[in-house]
Every structure is written in C-alpha cells, then in structure tokens.
Design a protein with these regions (language model features):
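Membrane-embedded alpha-helical segments that form the functional core of polytopic membrane enzymes
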Residues: 34-75, 107, 111, 124-136, ...
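Intramembrane alpha-helical segments
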Residues: 96-167
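Multi-pass membrane catalytic core of lipid/isoprenoid biosynthesis enzymes
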Residues: 83-124, 214-238
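Cytosolic, membrane-interface loops and tails of multi-pass inner-membrane proteins
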Residues: 2-15, 73-94, 191-218
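Interfacial loop-to-transmembrane junctions
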Residues: 258-280
Length: 280
C-alpha cells in the first residue's frame, strides 16, 4: 500500500513539474535561448563563462514567464483551439491563479537575476520584452488586429539584442541589425502557420490575416515580407560588422526562403498547399 502511494506521489509530482514546464512554452523558450546566445557570442566583448550561463538561464526564465502570462490571459481561447487545447490550464493540470503567480514571480526573478549576473541595460531590455509580449501583443493586439504578428514580433526579435547587451553593456546598430532580421522573418512564418490553422483561429475569433484579408492577400504578404529580408540580411555586412563568410551563406539561405514563399504564393488562386505552407 505504501509503495503504491509513493509511486503515485512521484508520478503526480512529475506531472506537476511537467505542467509548469509546458506553461513556459519550451519550444519558444529554446528559440529565445538560441537567438540570445547568438547575440552574446557575436558581440565584440566577452564575459566569463559562468556569468554567460547564468545570464542565459535568466533570459530563459523571462521567456518562460512571458509564456506563462500569455497562457494565463488566453486560457479561454486555448480551450477552443485544437492546437492549444492540451495546454496546462485548459486540461486542468494548473489553475489560472497558479499560472499568474508563476508568471509574475518568474518575471521578477529573471529580471533581477539578469541584472545581478550582467548589467542594467540587459535586464531592462528583458523587462521591456516581457512587458511588450504580455501587454502589447497578448492583451492589446492579438484579439484586435491581423497586424498582431507584425507589431508583436518586436518582443520575439529582441533576444539577440539582450544577448549583445549582456556581453557589451550596450545596444549597437549591429545588434539592431540582427533584431531586424528576425522581425522581418516573423510575419511570413506565422502567417503561413495561420493559413493551415485558420479554422482554429476562427473558433477563437482571433483576427489572423487569412480570416480578415483572405488567403490570396495572405500569400502575397508572406512573399513581400520574405523579400524584405534580402536588404535586411545584408545590414551586418554593410556596417562592416561581418564579412563574406556571413554574407554569402546568409544571402543563399534568404533566396532559398524567398523561393519557398514564392512557391506558396504561386499555388492555385485563393488556395494553398499544406506542405508548401509548412515549409515556410
């Protein structure tokens, strides 16, 4: 009897921890860690290894905190959508209050920790990122305009700037150039996602581009934003921050991305191919 109870407690405890981990949007968090680490590594100044690791952990926690607050606010929408109905709050694994407390607490800890292990500029930029994602994107824009992805993309584009500021205690045009690359990539990627998740967004009454402007215009906007990446991708080279070892592969990859987006656009009018959309 005791053994059975012990096993049950272990399983429940593990499930509880897993629920909080999923609340932090681990996929998004991993992308944030990666882009922040890139910003940190390409910066001209270096910090010691332990500070770099603790700083990245703080940024990861900040990203997770923003994700938790997003799920807290959008739990009503998440329960309506196939893509999100298995998240911790809709499934009852966590309550809204637990998500709110966790999100606020983690936000504070992450910003304070980043200030301790790096500097005020990095910590302030992280704070701005969290606040922008939660209040500007989640609360204000997402339910009101199809431009939610464009403006809200500012938050998702800031991690390289944070990484750069961790190492240099500054924000430069070089770090902003990498911010712009992610900023112009974001709309095309997420509008492609919204094409094949349109039914989900319709259920939740989220005004994504395919629902407000139609499939054809969405495909056009995807192509336009992918083409805008070409001049932006050249910026690090144009400001003498990077050399040809960056420029040539970057241009080749961007042209390939342009081709993928054009392939999606060139499909049947007012229709799209699922495989082509998923490639974007």
């Amino acid at each position: 009897m005791t053994i059975i109870k012990s096993k049950t407690l272990k399983i429940d405890y593990f499930s509880y921890i897993k629920a909080f981990f999923n609340l932090m949007k681990p996929r998004v968090m991993s992308l944030v860690i990666f882009t922040c680490a890139v910003g940190l590594l390409i910066a001209p100044e270096k910090i010691n290894f332990s500070n770099a690791v603790f700083s990245l952990v703080a940024v990861a926690l900040g990203s997770g905190a923003a994700g938790a607050l997003n799920m807290w606010y959008e739990s009503d929408l998440d329960s309506l959508m196939t893509r999100t109905c298995l998240r911790p709050i809709p499934t009852g694994k966590l309550t809204k209050n637990q998500a709110l407390v966790f999100g606020i607490t983690s936000s504070i800890i992450s910003v304070v920790a980043l200030y301790i292990f790096s500097n005020l500029i990095a910590a302030t930029t992280l704070l701005i990122t969290i606040l922008f994602y939660v209040f500007v994107y989640t609360v204000w824009l997402k339910r009101k305009t199809p431009q939610n992805i464009v403006i809200g993309g500012i938050a998702g584009s800031l991690p390289p700037v944070i990484g750069w500021s961790i190492a240099t205690n500054s924000i430069s045009f070089a770090s902003i150039s990498f911010f712009l690359i992610i900023f112009f990539w974001t709309p095309s990627h997420f509008w492609a996602l919204s094409l094949y998740k349109a039914d989900d967004y319709k259920k939740a009454k989220i005004p994504m581009m395919p629902l407000t402007e139609g499939i054809e215009k969405t495909k056009l906007y995807i192509l336009v934003y992918s083409l805008l990446m070409l001049p932006v991708i050249i910026l690090p080279y144009a400001i003498n921050f990077s050399g040809l070892t960056y420029l040539l592969p970057a241009i080749m990859l961007t042209i390939y991305y342009n081709f993928i987006c054009y392939d999606l656009y060139n499909y049947k009018k007012n229709n799209f191919d699922l495989k082509k959309a998923k490639k974007v």
